[in-house]
Each structure stands twice: as C-alpha cells, then as structure tokens.
Amino acid sequence: MKRRISIAIDGPAAAGKSTVAKRIAERLSYVYIDTGAMYRALTYRALACGVDIHDEQALLSLLRDTSIELKPSPHGQIVLVNGDDVTDIIRGEAVTNAVSLVAKHPLVREEMVARQRALAEGGGVVMDGRDIGTHVLPNAEVKIFLKASVEERARRRHEENLARGFPSDLEKLKEEIARRDRLDSERETAPLRKAPDAVEIDTTSLSVEEVVERIMEIVNERIG
C-alpha cells in the first residue's frame, strides 16, 4: 500500500492552484483543502456583518465565532459558513478585492493555520494557498510553486468570472492581480514565498492537464 503524503501547492492569485490541486486530489483519492476559500469565507462574513476588515481583533473574534467547512460534492467542493452554502458568493468581486487585506492579519492567520494543520493531520491531503510549503505544512513531502504572467492570470480569472455569470473587466483584473501580488508578497506574516525545496512550474503556456501530469510524476517518485 502506497503511503499517504501531504502535498503543498503555492503560488500567486489565479496561477491555477485550485484547479490543479483538485485534479491531483481526485487522481490520488486525497482530501483537497482550499485555504484561500477559508480566508474568502471569513472575508464574506466580515463584509456581511459590517466588521471592519482593518480591525484585527474584531476579525479574530468573528473567526472564532465562525464555522468554516469544506465539503466534497458531485459538483466540486462546497464551502459552508455556519452551515450556509457560500461557494459561489465568496468568488464575487467584493470578497476578491478584500481578501488579501483580511489575510494579512497575523492573529487571523495563526487561527486559520491551526485549523488547516488539523485538517491535514494524517496525510492524504492536497492543500493549496500562499504559504502552505513555507508555513502551514513545512514538512510536506511534495511542495509545488505555480506561477504565471499577470496577463495570463488575469485572462484566466476573466474567463472564470464570465463562466460564473459575474461581470468582469480584463484590464481592471490585471491591476487587481498585480495589487494582490504586492500585498501577498509584502505582508509581514507568512508572505507569499517559494519554499527552498519546492519545485517551480510556470503554467503560463501549459494546459491544466500538462501541469497535473508534471506534478503526478513528482508525487509518484516520492510515494514509490
């Protein structure tokens, strides 16, 4: 029986992390943990409750009072906040524009990381985010860092928005993604960084399946 390992997939906004991580988890029958969705869920609740997203203590109190569940379904992972399905609404523009501001707070990240590590206990997980290989799961057996050009990432997010029925402006998305890159890379707590032992893959000109195959080769080497 092959051992069940932890796989960390990091990278900037819209680099293809979630799409690839889901496929890898399906191929291996592993649990997929979308850490970005957890921060989006908190951001959604903060906006819905009128909590100041710049107030770290208020956000921490809200998080401690918030149940965030990631559950598999025939149509993909669903996100529940206090039992309510928020899968689609957390991908909207309001949450997207605010999530990096929520995620930069050290106490919020500390609480989230504790939850994420608990979900990953025992292995058999694929977790994606900004700081999985460097901070959340530093001992993950496989670490991948995905990157792509701002233009390509904006194009992907634009197509994703249109497919979901959201209004979308390609030029505005380019500016927003570049802004999120700066926020994620410059924050003091667990900034976006490639782990020294991570394998970097530039997905700009690769299909999803090509990226998945490259990662599966690495995974199969590790699990024997």
Swiss-Prot record:
GO terms for cellular component: cytosol. One of its GO terms (molecular function) is CMP kinase activity. The gene is cmk. This is Cytidylate kinase. CDD domains: CMPK. Its EC number is 2.7.4.25. Keywords: ATP-binding, Cytoplasm, Kinase, Nucleotide-binding, Transferase. SUPFAM superfamilies: P-loop containing nucleoside triphosphate hydrolases. It comes from Geobacillus kaustophilus (strain HTA426).
